[in-house]
């Protein structure tokens, strides 16, 4: 939906009310906290140094304008682009100057060092580009001069260059994906700027020189639009990405055009629109693909990683040669040694293959301008042929001489030496590469030299590319990952030789030596048994090529666990371990989160590092002074309490803990003259009772002995002292001042204090009386907490306490006169007849929040008997506290102050997902009667109770009020438990909240912090009191709640907001927000609500303005909510050259919003992610990592750990969560260190913003090829010399798909993306430019993982087809009689599959869980997962990955698949599961099942049940999991009634005719056509290979017909041809029946029935005659079905490939009809086990238990959910 163009008056507010984004740069007189910083004023003032710059012609340049305005008028930039980049530049310069160490001498002026560093960083890519092309850089160096004027001019010139680049970047729209294109634009515009600054004259006019374009939107119209239209034309010609990649130019092709000087010659400046680069020229003469051509072929996996395959194939050849020899060691036999030389012939042959692949895929790059490429491709082919021939000739000469001499004569040995000399010449380049590998710094230096000599020397090996140079790591990292891979490769090769290759030698020889074997069919290739040998070796070779992935998985898991162990992960695994280290926790928090006082000199760095390391060691192991020695009055204790309490309050706001748990967890401030630190109650529980017990046992022991026993536990000491001080204060508080009772009490406490000081407690008092005093004190506190406050009871208790303390407590009983003399009894005579305290009680009012809160705390300390192991009760709260506390003992950079930290932004792309759950959504029920809210109430039961408690405190009287008064809170509560935008926004805004509070603590004085603890209690909430033992919590009249409770928020003075805003911005790229607003979508209102509640939130969207006449203008708009105006306001509106989406939608959405981000870093956050307040506190530490060298480079991407928060919903979600967790933790840990190949995988990584801005941004967007857009940011980073690290002391929450269908769609999306990656230029360049061992790491963690997963499935296919061939051909029977090795072979192959299944998925999870949760819990979790059939899920997922990865490489068809992020508890219908899994799993499983059944019928080995089971158990497991998993993990999947309904629904769907607009879920025909979409876009080779693969189905018929009795053991080819006659007859009968049905079934039904009768009669007659007059049996008929059914499916599959030729013929109707019957047949096969299990009693309950076992273990009533019974 588009809106009309806004008028000028409404487009923007009046100038006096100009809207600003973060800081009001336009008006420095505004009262804004950011403007108090001199650095901000200095940066803005520097921009106003216009001086004597010439005024742009035809423009109104006013004195108020600055350099940005001048550039905007000079080059025609948009006004809002200028405003946007002005703030961007000022903020960055100001933040950079704040961090400057030592601080500048003149803080009111911009330090030139800051600007110079920024200019070098921002323009480094441009300067490298100029050096690469050999052109002069137009950024002139500043003049070194101390003269003030020159310094100002230099500063201005630097500012102009930086500002010019930012303005170009800010308005380039989609061109930002092409960084070298921007370099080209900047290069020429900087040249024009230099001419203007130099005052040069135009050669044509003789007038002062001005840029070639100017005016309103001149840059957009003259530069951006022509290039944009070219990109747009290319994308449109791709037919929505379905055409081959080689047929059109994508972003990378157009960008790489600027990697050569021909761009400078062709495009010129101003741009020559007639150039063949632009879309103005015909496609035939236009510039084609540049740099690389993406061809769709499996050969890409070999071509990109040829070094790996050469290694594997050459070792395989060498191992076979050695294994076939009869010597123990190869050096014992010269024949074997010489035979090993054939590996060099193979090596040369593989190089020849590589050259052929290069030429066949990249030929379209050749043109008149790139003739050197043609020469290189040709020469490489010729040289490869020459080496192959040369090696072959020299090798043949060796054997000819040896055969001639009969022995290894001297002449023969000389020819061996000659051969080795040739080998030496051949491997010289490899030796040179080895030398450079050992000294990587030299290789980096050579590669980065832009010299013609270097290009000439490397021309043969590499194409000249701007990226992929200088990628070697440092020597230390080099050694680490080299050792890792040497160990892995050594293990793999030893295992392969002894357990794979050698065991096959004997069976191979036995087969080749079979001379008298006869085949059971017509054998086309004689009786050499080579096909049988090939079938024997094929699965072994596939396992050999694949199992390096297994060994990598094993060793990477071990290394990852070891690194995690040394990183101190998992040392605090639970709350109990946190209790033990809580005393050191505060010191650790202060050490890491509290900034140090920076010295003026940055020296002594190594000394500081050593001191920090020692301090961290002391903290970690409790050495030195812990926190228990710090008194409660010290600022450090208060600082820690403020942060800790803020974390606890955040938990309460998230409803993770209850009000009562807040009281138990919080660290209250000092009050009531308590002399010790007031530890959280959950630490002090039971400690006082233990102290009383010790006092009772040691009542006669000396004081120091008793006190030392109590002090053995710091918590016990504090509990005793706090209890005494609190009781003392409480009793004196409730007694009136000036009364005699007060005097007595003061004297009594004074006496006790004196005895304590003199260590006479045990000497003077009877400690056994303490227990009675304890009971009375508890009664007193309970009466005080009673809302009714019955004073007479309190008087009685006080009187009893007085008598105990005055009369019974002392060992020496004192008389009344003695007590009066000591001041411990009333002096007046009346007091003898009156009770004490009757008229002396003055209870505090009920609104005294502090008093009653402390009363409850003291009561808890006095009464708690259990150790409170379940505080907090919520699992997520416990895990978060444990991780946060553990992370503070890990190594991390120390945090700077907020003012000196690096600024950063968070960017989240959003399209149209849920923002908040609406009221109707929460109430809507599914077919089982389950609403979303009901589901959440059961899953998050404790959190729902906490929410209700909070709502009651905030005014809700009952649950009905929640649906009226508190419906917004209800919606938010539900939304925060789903994968919604509101959850993500809340999590990211914790950064803002944390920075505000940290900024206050950084700048607060000691008095401010002390005030925080004094003011806080008065603003605290009062929680609930316990009424007389009843567990029902009753609110007290004095209840209130406030964020002031932590003692921070209420102290914020305003400047903290400015600091936080300058350091953090959150931009959500809501691409269609404008459309949502225009049509009144509820999501627009909800997004506005989020902006209103979060100051730092900004929304970027694309606005489409209809100009009429079919013209539309597109604008990138940034909006915020103005708290003063109380409405949404528009900040920037920047016109785009056209529609936003040319490539993939998500990166385009990110790209348009990227210009609105701020800061040095940018964190990419997806819509399904979350964050926590306690983690946000550590962001300053993380950003400091950008300043540290990791290896030889500083990081450009900081990897952040993820915590999957959707693992507790169901067992299926747990499986996915466990798999994902091991990948995002252990996997990423190893990739970063030691392997140094971590990329960006869509994680919440933090990018160095100004490193990526000039290098193409944070993702790639080319259509289809970049469908996995995020990982290409990592590829691009590595290729351009970046460094990616991984940090596990901070984590971000992440949601994962929780239903099988959702998970499958996600797996399909990722697998398809990897299929496209395999074709991409980035993967090819990384495969060639990384050193050998990093290349191995890269392969096995990206494309190789999916390729090897596919090889696993291929191995199963090859093994089963091979066994079938051996069985049906008769070779197996003959071999069985002479050898039993084949049985061992089957066991070996099955062990391989089981090893893969276990180690691929289990080992990383077990080790990571062992590290973070402990070994026994990890083993128990693994056993539990197996009992819940996790292996079924992982095997099923393997099939999904295999299907989509293979199909994408072969045919394409990758697309974005919306997985959905809802809650999955509803039952999925059979038809839906069939549509999703029929082609990916069901048909493949049925095929394998038929193979096993045929094999069981005809194999002599299968007659032994044990051998058959041993050989096929893993295959049957795979078949079972592929068929049954969609129903096993489907709620109510085995409910009989649902199964019956599903079958009816499936039949109705199958026979639905459909129509033009019918969807796939409504009609089988529509779905069937959609399943063939990939065949429409595939190439000729894809179709040909598909047909070749489909030919396998004909093998069933070929092999089985010869085993029928009617064949009479004949092996003539005629038997097979006759069987085709039967198929033709069956098809003819079917066609006749279908034709009769269409022609006569409606109007002439009798004719139709007559024809049916004739057909049936004729068929029965033919069958009876054959049974009577031939040897055909009924069994033959049944077996023929096994033969003809696969043949029919093969014919249909081939017909689908040939659809363009058959569509217009009558054959196609028959194909459709037969295909429908086949899907009915397959559906019935799949439905059969489901129906059987549904019919069996009790199986549904078992399935529910399996699926939701995790929920059961947490006490959730999933059975109630599934039954839809809402219990009240």
Swiss-Prot record:
Residues in compartment: Extracellular: 330-335, 392-421, 502-530, 1363-1386, 1435-1481, 1530-1583, 1634-1649, 1695-1719
Topology of the protein relative to the lipid bilayer: Multi-pass membrane protein
Topology, Cytoplasmic side: 1-308, 357-370, 443-480, 552-1341, 1408-1413, 1503-1508, 1605-1612, 1671-1673, 1741-1768
Biological processes per GO annotation: (1->3)-beta-D-glucan biosynthetic process; cell wall organization; circadian rhythm; pollen development; regulation of cell shape
Coiled-coil intervals, chain numbering: none
Disulphide bond pairs: none
Top EC category: transferase
Mutant phenotype after disruption: Plants develop collapsed and inviable pollen grains.
Tissues where this protein is expressed: Ubiquitous.
Compartment(s) where it occurs, according to its Swiss-Prot or TrEMBL record: Cell membrane
Keywords annotated in UniProt: Cell membrane, Cell shape, Cell wall biogenesis/degradation, Glycosyltransferase, Membrane, Transferase, Transmembrane, Transmembrane helix
TM helices/strands, residue ranges: 309-329, 336-356, 371-391, 422-442, 481-501, 531-551, 1342-1362, 1387-1407, 1414-1434, 1482-1502, 1509-1529, 1584-1604, 1613-1633, 1650-1670, 1674-1694, 1720-1740
GO-annotated cellular components: 1,3-beta-D-glucan synthase complex; plasma membrane
Catalysed reactions, semicolon-separated: [(1->3)-beta-D-glucosyl](n) + UDP-alpha-D-glucose = [(1->3)-beta-D-glucosyl](n+1) + UDP + H(+)
Single GO MF annotation: 1,3-beta-D-glucan synthase activity
A Pfam family recorded for this sequence: FKS1_dom1
Presence of the UniProt keyword Iron-sulfur in the record: no
UniProt keyword Cell membrane, yes or no: yes
EC number: 2.4.1.34
Family membership: Belongs to the glycosyltransferase 48 family.
Known role: Required the formation of the callose wall separating the tetraspores (interstitial wall), but not for the callose wall surrounding the pollen mother cells (peripheral wall). Functionally redudant to CALS12 (GSL5). During plant growth and development, callose is found as a transitory component of the cell plate in dividing cells, is a major component of pollen mother cell walls and pollen tubes, and is found as a structural component of plasmodesmatal canals.
Full protein name: Callose synthase 11
Organism: Arabidopsis thaliana
Gene name in the database record: CALS11
